[in-house]
Regions:
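Mixed-charge interfacial surface used for oligomerization/domain docking
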Residues: 2-3, 12-19, 24-25, 30, ...
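N-terminal glycine-rich anion-binding loop in soluble enzyme alpha/beta folds
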Residues: 5-64, 68
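Short beta-strand segments
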Residues: 8, 87-89, 118-119
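Glycine/charged-rich beta-loop-alpha catalytic/anionic-binding loops adjacent to active sites
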Residues: 52, 80-85, 108-118
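Active-site cofactor/cluster-binding pocket
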Residues: 67-83, 87-103, 107
Length: 217
């Protein structure tokens, strides 16, 4: 069986120890908060990150671009590995498209290696679960083609349904209008959302109050 490495995006929200333990390389979608840009080797502690958000800090994110993707993959290819990349939903980010472009660019330099990009249509821990299935299948001795095929066949079975406590971040991401965010905040509206079969973030409904939103889930 050909050697291969699983790669993904850090949007899978898995612990960094998990990546290290399972020898997974991840593409870092950098973010800027309070004027400081955070890169792969300068992660902020998650507790500190969310504390700053609650205090009003507004992070902005950047997708992994083609060159950054190729820089992550080249050492793996140089070591004789194929690559199975499990990408953040193409309905939420351009990172999957960047990965596909990078894979095509690298074909010329590494004609004997194979790079397979799977659009997970997932986000956050849904993507993390997607990755974990791939990891367990690899441990069970499945080859890259078997794993990629299974993931493509079953990816619509990974369901995301969730609620958020703050409408302002949905407004900043273009998910709701400013008027809806302001009014919803005033009357304590909590949306219930899901990720559809094309990987887009779609509202399922809305209720008043955090407790009711959790019951709705």
């Amino acid at each position: 069986m050909r050697n291969f490495v699983i790669t993904t995006d850090n949007t899978a929200d898995l612990p960094y120890d998990y990546y290290k333990k399972n020898q997974i390389e991840y593409l870092f979608l950098s973010y800027t908060m309070d004027g400081k840009n955070y890169q792969k080797n300068a992660e902020m502690d998650p507790g500190e990150f969310y504390r700053k958000m609650r205090q009003g800090s507004m992070p902005t994110t950047s997708q992994a671009n083609v060159e950054e993707t190729m820089e992550t993959w080249r050492p793996l290819l140089d070591e004789g590995n194929d690559i199975l990349h499990l990408a953040f939903s193409s309905g939420l980010s351009g990172s999957c498209n960047s990965a596909r472009i990078a894979a095509n660019e690298l074909k010329e330099s590494y004609p004997d290696r194979k790079i397979t990009v799977v659009d997970s249509l997932c986000a956050s821990l849904g993507e993390g679960l997607f990755v974990d299935y791939a990891v367990e299948m690899k441990k069970a001795g499945k080859d890259m083609e078997e794993i990629a095929g299974w993931l493509e066949e079953h990816k619509l079975n990974f369901c995301h349904v969730f609620t958020v406590d703050d409408l302002n971040h949905l407004y900043r991401g273009g998910r709701v209008s400013k008027a809806a965010a302001v009014l919803g905040t005033m009357i304590n509206i909590k949306p219930v959302l899901h990720v559809d079969n094309e990987g887009h973030l779609i509202p399922l409904g809305k209720v008043r109050g955090r407790k009711k939103s959790l019951i709705k889930l």
